[in-house]
Amino acid sequence: MYFAIRLSFVLAVLFCLTGNGSARMLDADRNRLQQLQIRSQQSADANTQVDIAYEVIGIYDKYKGQGGSNVLREAQLNSQVNDFKRKTMVIDGVPAQGGVWGILGAIKKAADAVPDNVKKDAENLVKSSTKVLVRGIYDYLMGKMKQH
């Protein structure tokens, strides 16, 4: 009987610690998402935008497919994420299929041949598309995290 009571107590403590740990993780992820969203809105650098997007995607990957998920919205976000990753994938410092980095790299290599307004337009495209992706994931996850 004594053993059963002690075991129950230990299990109850472990249950509380586990539940509290996931709540802390949820709060940490929520806070990090808010920080990244603010940085995304304030940053004017294309490389920083891409770095922020990858970090937001990492957080999204932790929570997608869990209970209470909106399957249709996640399918849309997954499509956007996969498209983004395909366009920005870098392997050993070299763009996999060109994509965003190919555009920016080509612009940097041919800087003399490409007008400044074209370079600026390409960078603005990277920044705006990345901000849209970050905002979409942010809105979805913040809504989902409020449910918990």
Curated annotation (Swiss-Prot):
It comes from the Eukaryota. Its main location: secreted. One of its GO terms (cellular component) is extracellular space. The keyword Secreted applies. Keywords: Immunity, Innate immunity, Secreted, Signal. It is found in: Secreted. GO terms for biological process: cellular response to heat; cellular response to oxidative stress; cellular response to UV; innate immune response; response to bacterium; response to heat; response to oxidative stress; response to UV. Residues 1-23 form the signal peptide. It holds the Pfam family Turandot. The keyword Repressor does not apply. A humoral factor that may play a role in stress tolerance. Belongs to the Turandot family. This is Protein Turandot Z. The gene is TotZ.
